[in-house]
Amino acid sequence: MPDRCVAELRERGYLVFEGFLGTDELAAAQEALWLHYPRPEEYFADPAAHAGLVTSQFSGIINGPWRSWDLNRLAFHPDLLDLAERFLGSADLRLYDAELWARYAGTVDYEQNHHRDFGNHSLVVPKRADPAPQITSMILLSDVGDEDGPTKVVPLSVGERVPYWPNTLNEGTGAYVANYLPAGAFADEELSVTGAAGTLFTYRTDTLHRGSRMTAERSARFTLSAQYDVWAPRWTGRVAWAERALDSNWRELIERATPRERSVFGFPAPGDAYWDEQTMADTQARYPRADLTPYR
């Protein structure tokens, strides 16, 4: 990733980078979406058959790992790891959550008030002297125009005047609201995150943003998100990957990942005191196709 990407993320609080995914990896990921979701033409042919995906703004979310390596690998794409490492200032990265999110127009109103994500990513609040220990990255897996419910993001220079707290729940949408900000706040300052499929949108968890209404009649939007911090803090996070380690998709993920890629899930690194003859043998039994040579 170019140096300007790190600088923009630090200074503006967000980054929009078109062409993040190559043509082949984008096509493979898009095809893998249909292992989890109906294609748009299938959904709109019979919305009632897929009603479970549109009971709320968030009902189209599926947590990783997923049924395809072509999707799973995007959560730890090498260029994403490069960006996170340089921005967070550490190679000791933790992937603390990963989600697929499908949104279909016509039933759910995806409009939100402005909010910051740290509220359910941390037990405390960002430290203003060093306010960026976490980032969220969202990869667009479909084209997103102004009618497709683009995320609206507020530059740090504008949003920093809004206090971190209170952070309240909007019972109508199930989304949070920063400091009671009304609908329409920052209408002249916010940016619509539009772009072609394959675009990367990364933002800090102290950056104000919101979801917006899908206005195209048969619009469908698909994204993959990955959230990163470093391993040191005890007060941040979203999921414990061990809770999902019996999932049928987990074994392939670990078996195909490199030691570097495994490490972002908390897998013991080569050279860790954890490894001995017994743990090597039993871990190999658990992941029979994994190359554990680097851990010997």
Give, region by region, the residue ranges found by the protein language model:
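Non-heme Fe(II)-dependent double-stranded beta-helix
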Residues: 1-11, 18-128
